[in-house]
Amino acid sequence: MLTTLLIELLDRIRRPWVPLLGAALLSGCSSLDYYGQLARGQLALLHARQPVQALIDDPAQPQVLRQRLALTQQARTFASDSLGLPDNGSYRVYADIQRPYVVWNLFATPEFSLQPQTHCFPIAGCVAYRGYYQLGRARGAAALLRQQGLETWVGGVEAYSTLGWFDDPLLNTMLRWNDDRLAALIFHELAHQQLYVPGDTAFNESFASFVEREGLSQWRASRGLATRGDEDARRRDALTRLVLDARERLQRLYASGFPPERMRQAKAEEFERLRRDYRVMRDRDWGGYNRFDAWMEGPMNNAKLLPFGLYDQWIPAFAALFREAGGNWQAFYRRAAELGEMPQQERTRALESLAANR
């Protein structure tokens, strides 16, 4: 969820020094100050947790909060009972962290490249961002990277998964979503607990996104709700295709060998083309629906384009795998895990073959 949704490995080990190790696994930053802010942020999150059922049963709590939390528990039970996702304490506790995002992720690229600045570690593999619990720290780190000639983008994250090592809480940042999106987010994060392949973000996010989508369809059916035409999902998919097309053009430009000034001018023209194509699509196909205007019309650079495509690249492949498994979740998870055990090049070929047979 993204989005939405990119830090995945804090608290991997049940020991007092886990925040420091988790920070190292994710961030790639050698600064003890950086480790310290992650440790403090994660410990504050753990300290803020409360049992969801106690809040639901407390008449002193706002009725709207109690109703939303009750819905999350129905979705949480469905996730384990019907989707075969891990049955543990995650999302049966709640934390109000008093801010709009749980972390802010910082992405960075060179001026003429779409290759992210990455940080690689034995368990987490390589990740293309660093996470900060305070927006000011993320912006400060971004400023330092820009002084080194890198382009940066900072994006807020509503939730992340600790992959089952601790009981991940529901967060106030998650409750602003509508009922379907809230249930889908729970399915997505639990899917990361079900299967995670170090160093392969596209695989992990596509797997979780497929479980989210198929799980939401089954969740709605279980509640007697009609299958919906997900206009929001179609718009997101269309926007993603638009951005990926722009990325392909930029990659060709950066490989051209043009002098820097010419490349800089052509790059600016590509970003303006992206905005122009977006406006046409918005007005022609979406009836003026402007949810993405602020993102599109804001400052644009390579780093801002990095997250696109990560969440859906292999969804067609996982959909084909689910059909091959006869719609049986446990069989699907076993086959997905087998893919995850392959060397990355072999795994990519297998996913490409599955996607071709969708």
Where are the regions a protein language model picked out?
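Bacterial N-terminal signal peptides that target proteins for export
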Residues: 2-18
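C-terminal motif of bacterial Sec signal peptides marking the signal peptidase cleavage site
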Residues: 27-28
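Metalloprotease/metallohydrolase-associated module, dominated by Zn2+-dependent proteases
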Residues: 34, 45, 49-52, 180, ...
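Post-signal peptide N-terminal segment of mature Sec-exported envelope proteins
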Residues: 35-64
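Solvent-exposed, acidic/flexible segments
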Residues: 45, 58, 65-72, 131-138, ...
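Sec-exported extracytoplasmic/periplasmic mature domains
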Residues: 57-61, 70, 74-84, 191-195, ...
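Acidic/His-rich structured neighborhood in mature extracellular/periplasmic domains
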Residues: 75-236, 247
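Pan-zinc metallopeptidase signature
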Residues: 244-358
